[in-house]
Amino acid sequence: MVFPHIVIDETSLFILLGEISHYYQDALHAFPVLPTQYIDFALWQHDEIKSHRIQAQLNYWKNHLACAPTLSSFPTDKQRPDFLEQAGQTYSTHIDQSTVKKLREISKQYEVTIFMTLVAALQILIHRYSKQSDIVIGTPINERKHKETENLIGCFVNVVALRTKINSQHTLETLLQDIKQTSLKAYENSDAPLQTVISHLNVKRNYHHAPLYQVMIYVQSEELVIKLPDVHYEMIPAFTDTSKLDLTFYILTHHPEKFVLNIEYSTALFEASTIKKIANDFIALLENIDLLLPKKIEDFACV
C-alpha cells in the first residue's frame, strides 16, 4: 500500500493498520460508524479561516516572520536553476545508541523535547554552513486537536515556519531555550493553514525555490506496527526520486537504541557526496552536544 501525504498522514496509518489487524482477527465485528467524517473537518477549517481566532494567529505569523529571509544561503554544489524541478534522492544513515542516550538525557535535563534538541542542532548546522544568523525552517504539526478527529483517516497536518535568530555570542543552552519558546508558540498558532499564512504575508512565489523556507525537519516518534498473528511482515521505506525542498531531514526516534536519519535532497542542487558530509557533520554535532551546550556558538568547530 502506498499513499501520498496529501491524502493520509502518519496518524491515519496507525488507524488503518489497527483496523486491518482488527478485521484480520475478528472480521465479524465491525467498528462503529464515525459520527464525523473528513469532509466535516474540511468544512469546519474553511469556515474557521474567517474567525477572530485564526486572524489572531495570522497576525502572529506576520509578526514572527516580518523581514525574514525568503531564501536560505545554504551553499549548494550547483547553481540554482530558474525552474527547480522536484527531482531528488534520499541519503540514509543512523545516530548511534550512545548519542541517542545523550540526547534523551539532555532533553530531560533542560525540560525540552527531543524534537527541540534536534531543531537546535539543525539550526546550528545551517548557521555554520550558510553563515546566516536569521534562519527559517519548516516542520509539520499534527492538527488532530479535536476529539472528533482522533479516529479519522485523512491529512490533518499543517506545516509551520520556525524562525531562529542566532547570536554567536550566546551559548547553545540559550539557543535551546529560545527554540523551546518558538516551538511552543508555533504549536499555539498552528491552526492557520500554511497557504493562508503565505498569502497573508504577500510572499512572492517563484519557480526556483519554495516560499518561506527551503529546509524542513520531520521527527517521527512512533513506530508503525501491525499485529497479525502467524503473519510475517516487513515495513519497507518507500523512498521516491523526488524532493519538494532543497533539504528535508527525516529523523525516526522511536527505536530505543538508535535514531534513523534520512536526508531527502534536491539533485538539481546537491551532489550525493555533499549530503553525506552534511549528515556526518550533523551527527558529529549531536555526538558532542553535551560539550557544546555551555559554549558560545562562535566557538563551535563542527563544520
What kind of feature is each model-predicted range?
Residues 2-6, 18-26, 39-50, 59-67, ...:
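Adenylate-forming
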Residues 9:
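A Lys-centered signature of the CheY-like receiver
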Residues 12:
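Receiver (REC) domain switch/active-site region of two-component response regulators
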Residues 27-33:
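Glycine/threonine-rich helix-loop capping motifs at alpha-helix boundaries
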Residues 33, 290-303:
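A Lys/Arg-rich helix-loop hairpin that forms a DNA/phosphate-binding surface
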